From Swiss-Prot:
This is NADH-quinone oxidoreductase subunit H. It comes from Chlorobium luteolum (strain DSM 273 / BCRC 81028 / 2530). GO terms for cellular component: plasma membrane. GO terms for molecular function: NADH dehydrogenase activity; oxidoreductase activity, acting on NAD(P)H, quinone or similar compound as acceptor; quinone binding. The gene is nuoH. Keywords: Cell inner membrane, Cell membrane, Membrane, NAD, Quinone, Translocase, Transmembrane, Transmembrane helix, Ubiquinone. The chain crosses the membrane at residues 34-54, 106-126, 139-159, 178-198, 217-237, 269-289, 313-333, 352-372. NDH-1 is composed of 14 different subunits. Subunits NuoA, H, J, K, L, M, N constitute the membrane sector of the complex. Its EC number is 7.1.1.-. Disulfide bonds: none annotated. It is a multi-pass membrane protein.
Amino acid sequence: MSFNALPQSSMPLLMGNSLNAWSDALTGFAPMGLPLGLLVIAAIPLVFIALYALTYGVYGERKISAFMQDRLGPMEVGKWGILQTLADILKLLQKEDIVPTSADKFLFVIGPGVLFVGSFLAFAVLPFGPAFIGANLNVGLFYAIGIVALEVVGILAAGWGSNNKWALYGAVRSVAQIVSYEIPAAIALLCGAMMAGTLDMQEINVLQSGPWGFAHFFLFQSPIAWLPFLIYFIASLAETNRAPFDIPEAESELVAGYFTEYSGMKFAVIFLAEYGSMFMVSAIIAIVFLGGWNSPLPNIGSLALNDLTTGPVWGAFWIIMKGFFFIFVQMWLRWTLPRLRVDQLMYLCWKVLTPFAFVSFVLTAIWMIYVP
């Protein structure tokens, strides 16, 4: 595990010495001598990105839903209601943190925390540009796929610990849904890994760079890539409990699902984990199939659009914008498609997506072997 950053010759010497001192001081507390100071420093931008995604993700969803329902949405707090989410955060901070008398207090308390950790640990391997990645693992894609299992533990702990039948029903539905759809999602991502020849997410980005912009992206290099791309996008909706796969939180059936009994900051943490997962799966789609931090603009003659929009800052801009685009599509689908029944959801997974995922895997292998 390493922290990769481009050298900054203009960085003040005092700042460099301070960071080295903090890193040396914290190294002894990290497992296997890992420079914990660097990991803490690397985590700071990720925290801001996550909070940014939450703040404007919630605001964006309210505005999108209002537009589709011919409403204005939030308008009172700040210009065009842009501070509404901050007002909601302040409201949640003031709400009482209630623990039901009959609840298993240990499971009830750790459930949101485990869910949050499972959602945001994947951010460590997401490359937000050629100059920055928290943990450059050579199996980063495999890590991102597997870390979802922690979310299952958190959801089940929250549902069981609440000692509420609606919460338990919602947790069981969510666990069954996530575990089932993880199979076609993983196979679809392995198709992208097969095209790249590596599980290193930074290397996957590098292999999709070039002067022709989007023409170098895996999605446009092979006509077969569209199949695993669509399979993973559909499966990611189910993994994040987004419509039309939101049966674990069906208000008309289960009140609010596995977080029915939660209030205050515990509810806010669950909410943060949900929007963090939305951005995480959107970023993975962008990295594996759409070039990640690479610019989609091509060089056209003497107009070097790709060269002008490439670099560390541009890289972060492109991957965040691509991620937000897929978040917008998720929100769009929520207010467009009706909710599936449980039997329809499982039918789609096991009899449609999973067989097509295996077919796409075989076709991708054939394409990589026989097509130069």
